[in-house]
Amino acid sequence: MDYYGKRVATASSDATIKIIGVNNNSGSQHLASLKGHKGPVWQVSWAHPKFGSILASCSYDGQVIIWKEGNQNEWLQAHIFNDHKSSVNSIAWAPHELGLCLACGSSDGNISVFTARADGGWDTTRIDQAHPVGVTSVSWAPAMAPGALVGSGLLDPVQKLASCGCDNTVKVWKLYNGTWKMDCFPALQMHNDWVRSVAWAPNLGLPKSTIASASQDGTVVIWTCAKEGEQWEGKVLNDFKTPVWSVSWSLTGNLLAVADGNNNVTLWKEAVDGQWQQVTVVEP
């Protein structure tokens, strides 16, 4: 879904991307088909509209393609990245405060971060062997520093990433002087099978940082860090008794959507006592 909720981009195993217009009154209409990948497309992601009408896609073919809309509903391949040697499983645009910046996680174990320059080129930084058996998901931390709302003075935007992979772990990374370094010791490990999805919650400037992770083992874990520099603590939200494919936060960070292997999407909320409770099941 784009920023304005007007268009949906879909990724398919037939190697195509479709742009669909969504209208409250007349339903949906097909606007464009984007062809460029040579294998299943795993994920698509819209950039913030301040950068124009831009879409990123990643595929089993190892490529990441940046698509740009020229004339209305005419999409061009603005850039193709061939940095990865195997399937690129996850892409995530950074908070817009950090510029036009895309993180990519691959089955080759590496994470690459591409940042657009003013001259139209791209700078690349890498996290080599972030998860040696394969990276399954990446998610950016909010740009607003934890505690910025309750602190004083101006703080620089935060450049942090969460990742997960086939080594059953979640890891947190921070950019120090142009180099990505692990920011959690040890790696966050409460799952006993592949971690399929990781999502960093919006924190609205509050001191606590929160990450959700979903695993093949059927559990979703909520990781919290009370304040910068402290250890992350994990709590199992629920055991779904079936692989969990995806977790996603609401814009305010107080609702978590969970998609599981039984084709259910459930919404969860933290109660006053710190326990997580199911709020509803999302009906298709």
Regions found by a protein language model. Name each.
Residues M1-G5, S45-G52, A92-G99, S139-V158, ...:
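Loop/turn segments within WD40 beta-propeller blades
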Residues Y4, H30, P40, F51-I54, ...:
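WD40/WD-repeat beta-propeller blade-loop signature
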Residues A11-D14, S57-D61, C104-D108, A116, ...:
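Conserved strand-to-loop turn within each blade of WD40 beta-propeller repeats
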Residues I17-V22, V44, V64-E69, I91, ...:
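WD40-repeat beta-propellers
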Residues N25-H30, N71-Q77, D119-T124, G178-C184, ...:
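Beta-strand initiation motifs
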Residues L34-V41, F81-V88, D128-V135, A141-P142, ...:
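WD40/WD-repeat beta-propeller blade N-cap
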Residues A78-W173:
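Solenoidal tandem-repeat scaffolds enriched in leucines and small polar residues
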Residues A226-P284:
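C-terminal interaction modules of eukaryotic adaptor/scaffold proteins
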